[in-house]
Structures are given as structure tokens and as C-alpha cells.
Amino acid sequence: MAEIEGRLHVSRKDWKGCTELKKQDIKEKNMQGMIYGIGVGPGNPELMTLKAARLLREADAIAIPGKEKETCTAYQIALGAVPEIEEKEIIPVVFPMTKDEAVLKESHEAAVKSLAALMDQGKTVAFLTLGDVTVYSTYGYVHKKLLALGYESVLINGVPSFCAAAAKLGISLGEKAEPIHILPGSYPVKDGLKLSGTKILMKSGKKIADVKRELLLTECPAWMVENCGMEGERLIRSAADIPEDAGYYSLIIAKDREEQ
């Protein structure tokens, strides 16, 4: 007996050896739906994985992080790779941009309730996320809650935005024993830039002026990519040229200062 992507697969020989109670347990487990948290990549539909595309085609419903599919970036990326999803059931899941723990908890619980209801109907759901589902993805909270309730939730990797950004810039993120640090926008900028190796500053839009100032003070090599793989993409190759009006989808890569 083996479990493959949330389903129990039993050989004929093993099935004959199962008790009636065990057979019923297997049937009930396989009747329940499941959910995939799918990373659609950073922006270009061509960067979405073959596995992600296959699972989107097979899914009964598509859950999107937003109110409408027309304005949901993750959905538009997936649509570019798999046009067939336009005919599927769309489930809007809204996560407010706030640090209020009570509001966040309420939105997570509402998301879990709506997704669980679909799985209770035996449906397979694909939840879309930008970049990679394991890197600062809101789905992570929902994933843990669904697992705790006994539902099958599987994470499907996508190309991380910082890997795509480095490729766009034509630079390496790590060489030899060089460490790589991934820092959220909420991390103290000054402390982060003191770390040795490559520093990847995610979602720094609101603090971009502070980040730029610290980068200029440290005189370390820095790059910025805005809207990687999307419309309005910008590549910046020095700290001095980083715009202070950079948008939400802005990512900065900083290296150690080169010794003269």
C-alpha cells in the first residue's frame, strides 16, 4: 500500500487481505478531495513547471489570492500557461494586507472553511501563489491549518522570484562557500546588510528609501529587479539608481563590498 499525492493506492493482493473496516477507511480517504498549493513562478508563464500545469488542468476548482481573477497576478500567470483554467470554478480567497493578528486569523479561518467545504465535496483544488509556495507565501498558514484538520494539502514548487531576478541580471546568487540570506521587508535593513555573503531583500517597496540609503553607506554592490517577468519590468544595476518609488514587486540583491 502506498500513498501517492494524497491518495492511497492498494494492489489487488493487498486489497484482498484488508479487513472490511480497513477497506472502508481507504474508500473514505480517497473520496475526500485534496488541495495543492501551487507556485506559479515570478511572472513569465513560460517559467511555470510542467507539474504545476498538469495539476491545474486536472483540478476541479482554482483558488486565487484575491477578489477577482482579472486583477489576480498569480491567476493571470497561470492562465498564460494553461488557458483551460478559464473554464474552471474560481474560488476567491482574500487575505488583507495588515499586521492586525485578529484580522489575519479571521481571514485564515474563512479561507480554511471555504476550501475545506470544496474538499468535503470530493473536489481537487489548486491554490495559486506567486513565485514558490514555500517562500513567504500566505498559503503556508492555510496549509498548516488544513493539515491539522486532517485534509490532504500538497505543496508544489515554483521558480522563486529571486532566482529569476538573478538570472535576469546575469549574476550568481552564491559561489563556493558564499552564504545566501533571504530577508523579508520587515527585517532591520542595517542588521541585514551586515550579514556576510549575498543578501536578498524581499518586498522592500515601503522601505525602499531606507534600503537605498544603507546600501549607499555600505558601498556594497547592489541590484534591483522590479516586476520580474511581468509588464513594467525594470532592471537596476547600482544602488545609486534604485528608484524610491519602486513598487510592491521589487527585489534587491546585495553582495559583500569588494576589497581593493
Model-derived segments and spans:
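Extreme N-terminal basic, low-complexity initiation segments
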Residues: 1-10, 132
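Short gly/pro/ser/thr-enriched loop/turn and capping motifs at secondary-structure boundaries
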Residues: 69-71, 98, 160-163, 230-232
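Structural signal for conserved beta-strand scaffold positions within catalytic alpha/beta enzyme cores
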Residues: 64, 91-94, 155, 175, ...
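A contiguous loop/helix-start segment that scaffolds small-molecule binding in enzyme catalytic cores
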Residues: 35, 193-260
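Class I SAM-dependent methyltransferase SAM-binding "motif I" and its flanking Rossmann-like core
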Residues: 134-195, 243, 257
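Class I S-adenosyl-L-methionine
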Residues: 28-45, 50-53, 57-151, 240-243, ...
